[in-house]
Amino acid sequence: MSESKGYQVNKQILAATTLSVGATSGIGSIASQPRITRWYARLRKPSYVPPNGVFPVAWTTLYADIAVTSATAIDRLRAAGRDKEARNYVVALAANLILNAGWSWLFFKYQKLGASAIGAAVLAASSADLARRAAAADPRAGAALVPYPLWCVFATVMSAHIWLLNRR
């Protein structure tokens, strides 16, 4: 993700972003325990919703991407003396990860379909902002992060459609 072939991201920064993303994944997964998945199976869903097995693969890939690209962006910003931008990136990442885990709680745990559709839209906007910030630090990191907001837009469409199909 850099112009030089020998670039290695700062291991401490990578460890911090990996732990943060891992915590997000864990907190989000608590909300979707087996009892909740039975509820999800009973929901009316549009035909384009992927099979359940796609979601853990997609999210594991996206979480790894978020950790690596965010570490790269933060490291690049700090190395360039752009400390304020690095701090702002960390704040934006933290907010994004809170929104990310929060969606699972809104949708699965609290079964608030309308609120989760709105939450997904806010997460998509936050994810696009994160990709923009990453691109400002390192264009390749920004490009590598683009699948995240795209998936979040897809999740927004799915969430909204599920909400519409299941309104009472």
Language model region names:
Residues M1-R168:
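Short amphipathic, positively biased membrane-proximal segments
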